[in-house]
Amino acid sequence: MSLSIDVTSLPSISSSIYKNESSSTTSTLSGKSIGRSEQYISPDAEAFNKYMLSKSPEDIGPSDSASNDPLTSFSIRSNAVKTNADAGVSMDSSTQSRPSSNVGCDQVDFSFNKGIKMNANLDSSISISTNSKKEKSKNEHKSRKHYPKIEAESDSDDYVLDDSDSDDGKCKNCKYKRKYFALRMRMKQVAMQLIEDL
């Protein structure tokens, strides 16, 4: 039995994240979203990452976001996402710019300036071949020894039928006494033949 696995090339996953500043894709959806407080999320992820990495982990709290931390000056752009806890978020698109004040607005549009392109290729080959060869030995065709058959009916009168051979009198006056002794003698012969063969 042989097992061979041939992997011509391992799974190669190549991902490229790129920024496209010139064109922006606007997708519109309709639905509701629940927020706890009114907040704005800025799409400028690089500046937000720099800010979050500059703080110690103990100082980061729920108030650290792009809009409600006074130490950072993130401009709320026209394509920022606004959530309102009271009214929810309606995902209807709007091409107008967002108001910068705290006026309730339940319209959201998404503008994606980043694109993710992923490519995964899997080229592999698995071959399984099972070959079992039976080696025939010379002794396989050799005839087996045939031991003498034990016949249940034996009419030979060669056996002694006295009480000394009857296993302490357990088989006295039994109608199968002759067959019992014949069987016992045959078993002794078979046992002796087995011992000689070994």
UniProtKB/Swiss-Prot annotation:
Mg(2+) binds at D92. The keyword Iron does not apply. GO terms for cellular component: host cell cytoplasm. It is found in: Host cytoplasm. Its cofactor is Mg(2+). Keywords: Glycoprotein, Host cytoplasm, Magnesium, Metal-binding, Nucleotide-binding, Phosphoprotein, RNA-binding. Residues 16-37, 53-72, 85-104, 126-167 are annotated as: Disordered. Coiled coil: none annotated. O-glycosylated. Hyperphosphorylated on serine residues, when in dimeric form. Phosphorylation by host CK1 is required for the hyperphosphorylation of NSP5 dimer. Residues 16-30 have a biased composition (Low complexity). GO terms for biological process: viral genome replication. The modification Phosphoserine is found at S67, S154, S156, S164, S166. Residues 153-166 have a biased composition (Acidic residues). GO terms for molecular function: ATP hydrolysis activity; magnesium ion binding; nucleotide binding; RNA binding. Pfam families: Rota_NS26. Residues 91-104 have a biased composition (Polar residues). Homodimer. Interacts with VP1. Interacts with VP2. Interacts with NSP2; this interaction leads to up-regulation of NSP5 hyperphosphorylation and formation of virus factories. Interacts with NSP6. Participates in the selective exclusion of host proteins from stress granules (SG) and P bodies (PB). Also participates in the sequestration of these remodeled organelles in viral factories. Belongs to the rotavirus NSP5 family. Plays an essential role in the viral genome replication. Participates, together with NSP2, in the formation of viral factories (viroplasms), which are large inclusions in the host cytoplasm where replication intermediates are assembled and viral RNA replication takes place. Orchestrates the recruitment of viroplasmic proteins such as capsid proteins to these factories. Participates in the selective exclusion of host proteins from stress granules (SG) and P bodies (PB). Also participates in the sequestration of these remodeled organelles in viral factories. This is Non-structural protein 5. It comes from Rotavirus A (isolate RVA/Human/United Kingdom/A64/1987/G10P11[14]).
